Amino acid sequence: MKKQGFGTTKDGKEALLYTLSNKNGMEISVTDYGAHLVSVLVPDKDGKKRDVVLGFDSVTGYETDGSHFGATIGRNGNRIAGAAFELHGKTYQLAKNENNNNLHSGPDGYDYRLWNVEEADDSAVTFVLMSPDGDQGFPGNFEVSVTYTLTDENAVEIHYEGSCDQDTVVNMTNHSYFNLAGHDAGSIENQTLVLKAEQFSPVIDSASIQTGEHAPVQGTPMDFTSEKAIGAEIEADFEQLKLTGGYDHNFILDKAVEGSIELMAVASCKESGITMEAFTDLPCVQFYAGNFIAPVTGKNGVFYDKRNGFCLESQYVPNAINQEGEEKPILEAGDTYDTTTVYKFIF
């Protein structure tokens, strides 16, 4: 494990970058600022290492990043309609930071904070954060850890664990943007994807709040049950894609055993020879094709733009806390929040 400076935050605190490597030539870097996944170096079919996630060279880029490159999102990922929810008869008001809704817990997300480092060794780093009662509008003192592990099986494991002294809402995720040709390779539309999902969550309008329906993907451009290029139907004359400018939808995973870590997606790049398998124990995944990446200069001076990376964000159904019939992301006082998402690389 290598530790080095990653720049100084705007309030004068030093951020650190931790680099882990395995026996097969893979290498990942993570920072204590926002518990971001900064880089994932994977050997391609010719043995050349490619960095397959978008990001920045120092903490400064992450402080102003609105796209959440590599971010740990908390307390709640995705959207909450009306930026409010009711729990045990009490209404909790959150920040309205996208339209009239709350996105990724508001402008003071966990990805804009300096985390403590609890443990670091050659294969894993654990970041810890205390989120006090009322933080972002959520109830309860929530203590959470995020552990990044790089295995010799070429898997990046992200393990979340936390507890709270009151019942609260917790639905954390990682917002990495992947480009299996390399972060500097431009469009991801020729890369292929399989999603282990026969249903998706349609949205009401361009504000991207779900209708509450679980709609079949079959016969629509939302069908990724067999391998398909991301860009094959992204501009199709299909209302759901028009509303969101391309893919940015929740997919309900076909789980064999509820709560078990199972395959959720397989993405591949023929040009690099790199394949990524993604696994989670959560019930859903948000597939986002990077439709609204704001033009920005990233790592090594590379210019990022629309659809230069895609996200596979494991999660509960977005806005489930406000919808009847959905599994709600409620962490009860004294219980343990415990979930794992894995991105495994084949090269």
Language model features with spans:
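An exposed, glycine/acidic-rich loop-and-rim segment of catalytic or binding clefts
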Residues: 1-347
